[in-house]
Amino acid sequence: SGIENLSLIPGTAGAAVYQNIGAYGVELKDVLESAKVLDIGSGEIKTYSNKDCKFGYRNSVFKTNKKQDLIILKINLRLLKNNEPNLNYPDLAKMFEGKKPSALEVRNAVIEIRKNKLPYPAEVGNAGSFFKNPTIKTSNFQFLISKHPDLKGFDQGDGTVKLSAAELIEKCGWKGKTRGNVGVSGKHALVLVNYGKGTEEEILDLAKEIKNVVRDQFGMELEPEVEVVGGA
């Protein structure tokens, strides 16, 4: 067990390391032992430890250091023989209240949650979560909830609170909105979708409009989680 919470995230093993994918309380950094990497410049194959990967929130050394031409060839994961389910995510905790589920049961539950909340990329064009969940100081969060008392925050235990970008966007009235050929998913406000003929420019314009609205209403600056290749 160890990666069941990451079930149904589309992509490849190398991309999982590059992005430090995460969902439902688990990130790849929690289970990665090492990665074999090809340095195209020197032709050398190197082994990167977990520490060498310099993981951050949806980030890694492979993402921040683009000057080096590196290809992730293979990854080694450290999984647990004894099942220790991570039920920190509220929906999972509710589903398994008073029970210790198996890794397979958690996997099936995560798949069910994802299918209900997120459009599948093969059916509706999207890149998953478009924005990162912002983190602010606890003192700033206290000020924020004095104006928005129903706003949820997740204490990080280090003097900061993580907010739900989806909740911020939804409270601004953007869930399910469309702009021409693109829009915000009606299933999850953090997912921007292409209904078939949308362009990169339309998606980026939509993202900019959402960022501006959230900034105006909450004073929060949303950062993209997706990586834009090239430019409109």
Question: What spans do the regions from the language model cover?
Answer:
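A short, local hydrophobic-aromatic micro-motif
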Residues: 1-4, 33, 46, 73
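A gly/ser-rich beta-alpha-beta helix-loop segment of oxidoreductase catalytic cores
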Residues: 3-34
